[in-house]
Amino acid sequence: MPNTQRLRIAIQKSGRLSKESQQLLKSCGVKFTVNEQRLIAHADNMPIDLLRVRDDDIPGLVMDGVVDLGIIGENVLEEEQIERQTLNKPSTFIKLRELDFGSCRLSLAVPNEFDYQDVSSLSGLRIATSYPNLLRRFMAEKGISYSDCMLKGSVEVAPRAGLSDAICDLVSTGATLEANGLYETEVIYRSTACIIQSNEAQTAEKQVLINKILSRANGVIRARESKYILLHAPTETLEQIIALLPGAENPTVLPLNDDTNRVAIHAVSTEDLFWDTMEQLTALGASSILVMPIEKMMG
């Protein structure tokens, strides 16, 4: 029997979210080692068990209360929720936050020779997909009838193989579509990875641990989106220089030893500091400009 006192987190065993999910948890201070032959990894420093499962199993495990947290793509989450609602199975959860990885879109695509005008061009045609519920909802909203061809993988080859007239599949860069003689026509759903929590009541100890993981995840993501900027600036152009720093709030201004005409500026920026901005800073007399990544942030 599983130890219900330990926090159970479901993550993708393999695939596009697996590595980044593990890295996020490690960045949050969860120490664990993954054995590829085992589906459960036990944290060394916290009462946490990681369940490494298929991505389409994660929503159900969370909704059924088998695990406490899950890291999953919103596309898989939404697809499974619609399916479970249809079957009158538990389908509720708490979305704790979206994450900064796993971005993609679910799109309709057709062969290059297809004369596509709008979504009504697909009326009465056959569409191959791994996401029948999301596709069905979109087409119902548009009032378009069609037939679907359910495939678990390699959806992009369906038109060429004569299985369908069009496809509905995940797109990141569009390179796979292009390689298979297809072009994107409609985005029907935009997705990113997210952390979800079971609606089951948690013990006080587990909820404290969940809050800690969430707080640390927030700090890790803020740090990834931020840069630490240090520079020296003439006092006569100080206000202009501060105004140029993108997204900087309340920078720290410190005097320089034995130089009353210049100060040191320390700032956290939540936007990219591009080369042209650095050149403008230099033109205003700034020097020793350093832009550094931030590993962790809190508060």
From Swiss-Prot:
Q: Name one GO cellular component term.
A: cytoplasm
EC code: 2.4.2.17
Q: What keywords were assigned to this record?
A: Amino-acid biosynthesis, ATP-binding, Cytoplasm, Glycosyltransferase, Histidine biosynthesis, Magnesium, Metal-binding, Nucleotide-binding, Transferase
Relay the activity regulation note. Feedback inhibited by histidine.
What Gene Ontology molecular function terms does this protein carry? ATP binding; ATP phosphoribosyltransferase activity; magnesium ion binding
Write out the GO biological process terms. Answer: L-histidine biosynthetic process
Primary role:
Catalyzes the condensation of ATP and 5-phosphoribose 1-diphosphate to form N'-(5'-phosphoribosyl)-ATP (PR-ATP). Has a crucial role in the pathway because the rate of histidine biosynthesis seems to be controlled primarily by regulation of HisG enzymatic activity.
Which family would the database say this protein is a member of? Belongs to the ATP phosphoribosyltransferase family. Long subfamily.
Q: What is this protein called?
A: ATP phosphoribosyltransferase
